[in-house]
Amino acid sequence: MTVYAIIGGTGLTQLEGLNIRQSLPMNTPYGAPSGEIQIGDYAGREVMFLARHGHPHRLPPHQVNYRANIWALKQAGAEAILAVNAVGGIHPAMGTGHFCVPHDLVDYTSGRQHTFFADDLEEVTHIDFSYPYSEALRVRLVAALAAEGCAFSDRGVYACTQGPRLETVAEIIRLERDGCDIVGMTGMPEAALARELELEYACLALVVNPAAGKSTAVITMAEIEQALRDGMGKVKATLARVLSAS
């Protein structure tokens, strides 16, 4: 049986309903992860949980130790990762409260520690990253969203920006021209690092605001926080359905 890990993003720093049996403080060659790895029972099976931004939420996207997080999950025994991400909507279909299970991504970040293949190498390794997300996991997420009656898109291109600021209107125009449908700040290098360690990885993205220029209103944290409160119940129900069906 596949060992699943859930990485919780903004709005999901705790997994309510997880019957925690163990909290592992992990040490890695890359420093400390965002927090302890919680291991317990959820939706009838064992699962790991890690809060990407820490609990409470304290780490901005550009300061998350992605290498330590992925390494720690691998060392704890994870085989597949379901990553939850809060995003802005670029494509007209991606309104607030809409879900997207992206099939591809574009990385616009800079300066992040983005690979395990950096130090004391005996040989250079080039991973195939043509399709960054596990299709098998994507299919399970899509089926779960449909069963939950959620509004969702079964495909989409995730633009990962540096953060922590939101994007300018001109930047969103550029991302849209590049073919991106949603925009977030934490999808990379997380997905690539998972691939380097041969972990299955997929993203469940919740749209919490229209991207810059996609609404006449100014984007506010109050708006984002309300969208997170409204959507987290569906996020947890979707994750539970994936796990119980796997």
Curated annotation (Swiss-Prot):
GO MF assignments: S-methyl-5-thioadenosine phosphorylase activity
Alphabetical list of InterPro entries matching this protein: MTAP, Nucleoside_phosphorylase_d, Nucleoside_phosphorylase_sf, Purine_phosphorylase-2_CS
Gene3D superfamilies per the UniProt record, alphabetical: Nucleoside phosphorylase domain
Site label Important for substrate specificity, positions: E167, M221
Pathway: Purine metabolism; purine nucleoside salvage
PROSITE patterns reported in the protein's UniProt record: PNP_MTAP_2
Keywords assigned by UniProt, alphabetized: Glycosyltransferase, Purine salvage, Transferase
Gene Ontology CC entries for this record: cytosol
One Pfam family recorded for the sequence: PNP_UDP_1
EC number: 2.4.2.44
Source species, domain of life: Bacteria
Keyword set includes ATP-binding: no
Disulphide linkage map: none
GO biological process, alphabetically ordered: L-methionine salvage from methylthioadenosine; purine ribonucleoside salvage
Record field: catalytic activity: S-methyl-5'-thioinosine + phosphate = 5-(methylsulfanyl)-alpha-D-ribose 1-phosphate + hypoxanthine
Positions annotated to bind substrate: M185, N209, P210, A211
UniProt miscellaneous comment: Although this enzyme belongs to the family of MTA phosphorylases based on sequence homology, it has been shown that conserved amino acid substitutions in the substrate binding pocket convert the substrate specificity of this enzyme from 6-aminopurines to 6-oxopurines.
Subunit structure: Homotrimer.
Its job: Catalyzes the reversible phosphorylation of S-methyl-5'-thioinosine (MTI) to hypoxanthine and 5-methylthioribose-1-phosphate. Involved in the breakdown of S-methyl-5'-thioadenosine (MTA), a major by-product of polyamine biosynthesis. Catabolism of (MTA) occurs via deamination to MTI and phosphorolysis to hypoxanthine.
HAMAP family reported for this sequence: MTAP (MF_01963)
Family: Belongs to the PNP/MTAP phosphorylase family. MTAP subfamily.
Name of the protein: Probable S-methyl-5'-thioinosine phosphorylase
